[in-house]
Amino acid sequence: MQDLKQIITIKGTRDGLSLFIDEDASFEEVLKELEEKIQFSKPKQDEPVVSVKVKLGNRYISGEKEEQIRQVITTDQRFKVIGIDSNLIPINDAKRWMDDSEVKVINRVVRSGQILEIQGDLLLVGDVNPGGRVVASGNIYILGNLLGIAHAGYHGDKDAFIAASYMKPTQLRIADYISRAPDYESDGVYMECGIIDTDQDKITIDSLKVLSKKRKEISGFERRMNNG
């Protein structure tokens, strides 16, 4: 069995205690040592409740095991857990973050009554016809005509933008901002994008060349769109 001192190390901080748990120890060993250390370090009844932060290192634990740790620490109500931190993230969270950071390239025409919705940035090679809708949690790039509805940053990302080779939408939405057809030129515009202007507190239309100076990450797409 490992030396108990190597399983859990307690360090005092201005906010309370930090518990560093050996990532190689079994969970059973961790719980056993935790019970002993908590009893030994328990403040007296007339002393304030102590805040505890648990550091797991490169160890991932389930919600059930996390709850077991909390119960051991708070069993006598002399400690309160203010955080359980790990250097690792659950697989589902990692996949979701990867989805949000990737650009989805889709070749199709979004026709009237159709909805195309994706996580992350969308690069649509094709048109959005009147009555069609494209929705993305990130930015929207359209190598084609935007004649329907586009909604970027639908999770609330106000930094998202919508760019199209030809823009004459019935509606643009970015986060919770909405801009309708009367806000645009009646004949439509080429190589333009919609972005939230924080000074005017609304969606405005600007050229892709201007936007590329503000958002360096779109420069590659801007060149592709300009080159057709």
Swiss-Prot record:
UniProt keyword annotations, A-Z: Cell cycle, Cell division, Septation
Pfam families in UniProt: MinC_C (PF03775), MinC_N_1 (PF22642)
An individual GO BP term: regulation of cell septum assembly
SUPFAM superfamilies: Cell-division inhibitor MinC, C-terminal domain
Keyword Cell membrane found: no
UniProt KW Ribosomal protein keyword: no
Protein family: Belongs to the MinC family.
Quaternary data: Interacts with MinD and FtsZ.
Its job: Cell division inhibitor that blocks the formation of polar Z ring septums. Rapidly oscillates between the poles of the cell to destabilize FtsZ filaments that have formed before they mature into polar Z rings. Prevents FtsZ polymerization.
Protein name: Probable septum site-determining protein MinC
Biological classification of the source: Bacteria, Bacillati, Bacillota, Bacilli, Bacillales
Name of the gene: minC
